[in-house]
Structures are given as C-alpha cells and as structure tokens.
Amino acid sequence: MFGRNFPFFNSIGGFYPRESLDSKRPSGTGYTSKVRVRDKYHIVGFISSGTYGRVYKAIGKDGRKGEYAIKKFKPDKEGEIIQYTGLSQSAIREMALCSELDHPNVVQLAEIILEDKCIFMVFEYTEHDLLQIIHHHTQPQRHAIPAPMIKSILFQLLNGLLYLHTNWVLHRDLKPANILVTSSGAVRIGDLGLARLFYKPLNSLYSGDKVVVTIWYRAPELLMGSRHYTPAVDLWAVGCIFAELLSLRPIFKGEEAKMDSKKTVPFQRNQMMKIIDIMGLPRKETWPGLVSMPEFSQLQSLAMSRGYLNRQCNLEGWYQSCLKNNGYSPGSAAGTPGAEGFDLLSRLLEYDPTKRISAREALEHPYFTTGTPVTANCFAGYEGKYPHRRVTQDDNDIRSGSLPGTKRSGLPDDSLMGRAAKRLKE
C-alpha cells in the first residue's frame, strides 16, 4: 500500500521523485529493543506533555546526525501504581501508520524504541508549527502572513494529504498545531493519533470514534451526526486552516458542547451557528444528503429559533474584508491571494461533502498554477524570523524508570490543545 518512492506532486501536473528528497529515516523502520534511548540520543530538553505522555528534543549520537523529537508514551496509572495494561488505540494507530508512511510532507518517523515497558517514538524535529506562526503574526507591529508563504504552506499541506488519501488514510485532526514546519520551510503533517485506514472498514467509522476533529475544524457532516464519512472531512479542515492563515484567527470559533455521563454525543449547536453566520444555512436543494443526517431536526430547530431560514452565504464578503483588514493588495497581484484564492476557499468549504474539492483537484487549482510560482521553502523571500520552539531544562528526565507526568507549573500541558484552549478564552 505505502511506498518510499511515492512521488511528490508539483504545481504543473508533474511529480518530483521521492529519491531526490532527503530523508533521515533508515529503510525498514520498525521496533528497536535491547537498546536505551540515552545510548542513541542526547536529550536537549523537554518540549510538552499531554494525555499521551511527554515529548523531548534530542540530538543523535554516534553518527546519527540531526535533531529529533522523542515522544514517550506513558502507561496507564491508577493512583500511584503504574499499571502496564497496554497502549491506547491512538498510540497503536500512530505507530502502525508512521512506520509505513513516507512522504516529504508527512512527519518522518526515525524509529520506535521499547525500553523497560516504555515506548518511545523518535521523529524528525520540526522547529515550528502553523499555530506558532499564526500567533507570531498576531503580535503588535507585525503584518499578515505573506501571500506567497500561504500558497506554499497550503500546497505542501495538500500534497501530504493527497499522499495520505491515496493510501486510504484519513487524518481526522488537521489543525494549525498539527501542521509542522521545519526551519528550512518544509511543511509536515503531524500527529496521526486519530488517523485511520478507510479502505473497506469492517464497521462504520463512527462506531470506532464518535468524536473526531477539533471542534473549530470539524466538517458540517460530522456536526450533523453522519455515521460514515469520507476524506472530505480533511478538506474542510484544510479550508478552515487556509482561512485562518489569511485572517490570523479561526474562521468558525465555536464553543464545544461536551458529552454527558452516558457518553452521548450532543448536537454542536454553537459551532453550527458560527458556520451558518458566514456560510449561510445549508439547504437540501444544494445538499441532498442533508435530510438524512441524524441531527437534521436539530438544524431545523436552530434555524427557526435563530432566524436563520433566509441566511445566505457571505463567504465572499468575509474574504474581501479579510484581505482589506490584513493589508493584502487588491486584485490578483503577487501580494494577494486574489480571486483564485477565494474560489479555492469556497470549494474547500463546500457544505456537501460529495461536491467538496479533493486534494488532487485542489493541487491543480488555478490558485497554484497561475501567478506567483509555488516554492518548496515556504519561508523563501520572507525576511522576518520566527521564534524557536520552547525547550526547557526543568524536566528533561526521559528515563523509562521516571514517572511519566502530566501538567506541571510553568510547562505546557499538551501543546496541541493547551494553546487552542487559551485562544478560546480570548
């Protein structure tokens, strides 16, 4: 299914051969036992922690050049007693998929190490992520993200997504924090903990994971309770990311309703309202499958109570306002995403998943094939500097015997969700 020679799609319809791209990963990535992490890597410091465990920055020893991010999974814990009852489904999926996937726009796994009942995933180190980049541009006296940089980021993201979808992999959690960027401007899709194969599933995708995709990037068919879904859910998330790169804030910033004690998934009323405010009310005339959605009656109730029955799409108004407020040049000049950018955004944010643009179609869109050429380095031509990822020396004990921790004072708790939660309060 997967292959190390999968081609790299380019903007003029050709392919870059995989062999021409540098990779730190040796062939046949798999599990390594009877070896200690510290024998192969020098631990520089601690990056972040979360429900999965902890992440550390490291440098290779004994001829292993380069920097690495080591994810240490923590075992189940009951009180002060660690119970080695196995790994989460998320960890197993991530290890299985990352061991097979190999593409320049998907995060690279170097190896997996088993040490004294602890599992370590060793990834290439990436200095930035899109959430960090977006946050940098929101600070006073800073400008919008340059249009050529957005084009390169989006192209590389779609290129990696095409590889995943071609190999029957749904990511299911695309968001700025999970889109990594190397110091040389290469974009990598990261965090495959919610990813899964969708080729001839034995059960509906809903039966395995009832809640997927962070709420601000969740596709309308998921909000409407669809029991089965397609790669189109990832393309909606790409549209949300595209909009966020342009506006420097989430386009659909709703509040998530949590599951009750019976683990019943509630209708995400507030998030659906945020989408309708910009996209208008979805209608069965343009989305025939809408009426069969489990939450259709909830949508009707929402439309009646909020006066949404005649709400029309205002995405173009939002787009033009965004360009004006962020100082992009009018028209289709090199310094603006232009009309082609709006057309691509509208196709990504299509309500009906059967009509939503695919990754392959998006890569062939005029937004990429006309105007300023796409660069392989998204930072090309940008004179500014982004801050390095925070690495602390306060807690860099990666030993398997050390107790895997959770949140600690002064340290980020799950950088992927913690920063998003902070922005929700703003």
Swiss-Prot record:
Its cofactor is Mg(2+). ATP binds at residues 47-55, 71. Its EC number is 2.7.11.22, 2.7.11.23. GO terms for biological process: negative regulation of filamentous growth; negative regulation of transcription by RNA polymerase II; nuclear-transcribed mRNA catabolic process, non-stop decay; positive regulation of transcription by RNA polymerase II; protein destabilization. Residues 41-368 form the Protein kinase domain. Keywords: Activator, ATP-binding, Kinase, Magnesium, Metal-binding, Nucleotide-binding, Nucleus, Repressor, Serine/threonine-protein kinase, Transcription, Transcription regulation, Transferase. GO terms for molecular function: ATP binding; cyclin-dependent protein serine/threonine kinase activity; metal ion binding; protein serine kinase activity; RNA polymerase II CTD heptapeptide repeat kinase activity. Pfam families: Pkinase. The active site is at 173 (proton acceptor). It is an enzyme of class 2 (transferase). Its main location: nucleus. One of its GO terms (cellular component) is CKM complex. It catalyses: L-seryl-[protein] + ATP = O-phospho-L-seryl-[protein] + ADP + H(+); L-threonyl-[protein] + ATP = O-phospho-L-threonyl-[protein] + ADP + H(+); [DNA-directed RNA polymerase] + ATP = phospho-[DNA-directed RNA polymerase] + ADP + H(+). PANTHER family: CELL DIVISION PROTEIN KINASE, CYCLIN-DEPENDENT KINASE 8-RELATED. Belongs to the protein kinase superfamily. CMGC Ser/Thr protein kinase family. CDC2/CDKX subfamily. Component of the srb8-11 complex, a regulatory module of the Mediator complex. Component of the srb8-11 complex. The srb8-11 complex is a regulatory module of the Mediator complex which is itself dependent transcription. The srb8-11 complex may be involved in the transcriptional repression of a subset of genes regulated by Mediator. It may inhibit the association of the Mediator complex with RNA polymerase II to form the holoenzyme complex. The srb8-11 complex phosphorylates the C-terminal domain (CTD) of the largest subunit of RNA polymerase II. This is Serine/threonine-protein kinase ssn3.
